[in-house]
Amino acid sequence: MVLYIILAIIVIILIAVGVLFYLRSNKRQIIEKAIERKNEIETLPFDQNLAQLSKLNLKGETKTKYDAMKKDNVESTNKYLAPVEEKIHNAEALLDKFSFNASQSEIDDANELMDSYEQSYQQQLEDVNEIIALYKDNDELYDKCKVDYREMKRDVLANRHQFGEAASLLETEIEKFEPRLEQYEVLKADGNYVQAHNHIAALNEQMKQLRSYMEEIPELIRETQKELPGQFQDLKYGCRDLKVEGYDLDHVKVDSTLQSLKTELSFVEPLISRLELEEANDKLANINDKLDDMYDLIEHEVKAKNDVEETKDIITDNLFKAKDMNYTLQTEIEYVRENYYINESDAQSVRQFENEIQSLISVYDDILKEMSKSAVRYSEVQDNLQYLEDHVTVINDKQEKLQNHLIQLREDEAEAEDNLLRVQSKKEEVYRRLLASNLTSVPERFIIMKNEIDHEVRDVNEQFSERPIHVKQLKDKVSKIVIQMNTFEDEANDVLVNAVYAEKLIQYGNRYRKDYSNVDKSLNEAERLFKNNRYKRAIEIAEQVLESVEPGVTKHIEEEVIKQ
């Protein structure tokens, strides 16, 4: 037993030793990778990067940057690369002692140092590339500026007439570029690449601005010397022609406004000659705005004349229509009021319309007189005609509505008479049906309803014979009589149907009288009620007793009665 225990312990120890050696083998691979990485980063070409700068002009800012980067290389090597060897050595020693965690910590420190060293290299590479790129950009901008300088100088010399009085100042401004180009060469020669870049970039922007001035100045001069004076002339003679055609353009103030614009235009060329183009553009924009305002006023007058010519005849027709309709209404009202009641306000409205129409005709005559003058302001005429058109349209609408009302009075009277005749005819027809029915006698309420309808009809007929007639009151009374007649007819139909139904029920029940005493008794009661004109109650009793001996028969009898 002891032997087994000893063997087990030995096995465990052997396994533990094996695991330790396995772990140390793995850790040693990590150390070997760190050594390989150290060997790789030792070959990073710091010096080659700096060698690219040495090809440049190592003076001034370039020399300062070069020295700083060289110093950074030494510091990076001492601070980051040199301690790596020691860290790796310590890791190996600790690993031999099976201190895995401590060994790993040393390796981690070594990797962090190498990361920092690589970052230092990347930063140096970016700085070098940035300096080289800046040198390249500077040279490209410098070459472009030299080309622009020569081209601008040549353009002013070859096309001096296009720039007018601004040519001299342009030449002066262009000549200022030459010493600034030379200054760039000095900055570059001194190695001050940042200052050189700022200088040449600013110079390039100034050249671009002056180039844009050179492109804009001929257009401004053309507008100032040719286009606007031409528009002034066209506007002046155009207005003169329109005045000959009869337009009143005094409100446009052509002469005074043009003189003011010419004075304002005279200040533009001096601004151009001083290269104050923004102020020159503002003045030109103001002049063009005022010209547009004048053109708008003139165009409005021309359109107003066309509109006046189109609407004049329409307004004439509408005024004549209003006058004729007013005369017709006055005549018609005098005739109609003899036969029909008319509100006094309607008659007053017609007289008021007459006064308004006469007033509008007077205004229209004044407008025509104004249009016959040698100079007419058509915009005012247009406004006045619009006023006339609006008012005469309202008057015509109101007169037409009143005329329709007068026509409607006659139509309403005829309709009321027709309805009254239909009521009389229908009343007699219904009453004849009551008399000819199987009723023992005509119920008293129908006699009363008939007499009431007769009384109302006589009353309305008397009102029809009176003059003037109040049509609305008559129409309302006839409508009430029609309602009475409808009620009379509906109730009469109900009674007639109930009487037939009750009679059919009693006749059908006679077959059960001998066999069923209760049937005989109930039918006797139903007959009594029938004779007293109580048809609904007679139906209830007859239905009840028939259903007791023959279920469903009453529904069949009712359907036959309805079909008849």
Curated annotation (Swiss-Prot):
Per the record, ranges on the Cytoplasmic side are 24-564
Chief subcellular location = membrane
Look up the coiled coil feature and give its residue ranges.
99-138, 190-223, 271-300, 350-435, 471-550
- Which GO terms of type biological process are on file? division septum assembly; septin ring assembly
Where is this chain's protein located in or outside the cell?
Answer: Cell membrane
Describe its membrane topology.
Single-pass membrane protein
Q: Which GO terms describe its cellular component?
A: plasma membrane; septin ring
- Keyword Heme included in the entry's annotation: no
- Which key words are in the record? Cell cycle, Cell division, Cell membrane, Coiled coil, Membrane, Septation, Transmembrane, Transmembrane helix
Q: Which InterPro entries does this chain map to? A: EzrA
Regions crossing the membrane: 5-23
Tell me, in a sentence or two, what this protein's role is. Answer: Negative regulator of FtsZ ring formation; modulates the frequency and position of FtsZ ring formation. Inhibits FtsZ ring formation at polar sites. Interacts either with FtsZ or with one of its binding partners to promote depolymerization.
Q: Which NCBIfam families match?
A: PRK04778.1-6 (NF003412)
* Entry's family note: Belongs to the EzrA family.
| HAMAP family the record matches | EzrA
- Know the name of this protein? Septation ring formation regulator EzrA
